[in-house]
Amino acid sequence: MKKISLLFLSILSGMGLCQAQSYTPVSLPSMFADHMVLQQNSSASVWGWGTASSTVKIIGSWAEKDTISAPVDCFGQWKAVLPTGKSGGPYALQVFDGTSKIVLNDILLGEVWLCSGQSN
């Protein structure tokens, strides 16, 4: 009986975590900003926060016909994979949820290299 009541309480407390929250404007981490470069001919992961149980839409001006939709989970987090095209730019990236909108400008698509090493 004790195990059943403990299980019941844990389920109830877990359900409380995913209750509907008040409106939260769509937002992105600080690494997504104007003047950024995305790798060409690949898939770029874009993520952020919004109102729980809503949908966020992402449009890159390099492929305006392709609108990517991402569901916002009960914790207010979302993630989408955005296909990138051939090199070029400047482009814009729009992220919106129907009420709030973020527009990132001057985005370039090209080669992104990460170099590291030891300096002596």
Can you say where each PLM-predicted feature lies in the sequence?
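Bacterial Sec-dependent N-terminal signal peptides
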Residues: 1-23
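N-terminal hydrophobic or amphipathic segments with adjacent small-residue motifs
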Residues: 8-10, 14, 42, 70, ...
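Intrinsically disordered, low-complexity segments enriched in small/polar residues
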Residues: 12-16, 46, 74
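A generic structural signal for short coil/turn motifs at secondary-structure boundaries
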Residues: 14-16, 35-36, 81
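Non-catalytic, glycine-rich low-complexity segments
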Residues: 21-52, 107-111, 115
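Extended acidic/polar, glycine-enriched regions
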Residues: 47, 53-116
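N-terminal intrinsically disordered, low-complexity segments enriched in P/E/S/T
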Residues: 119-120
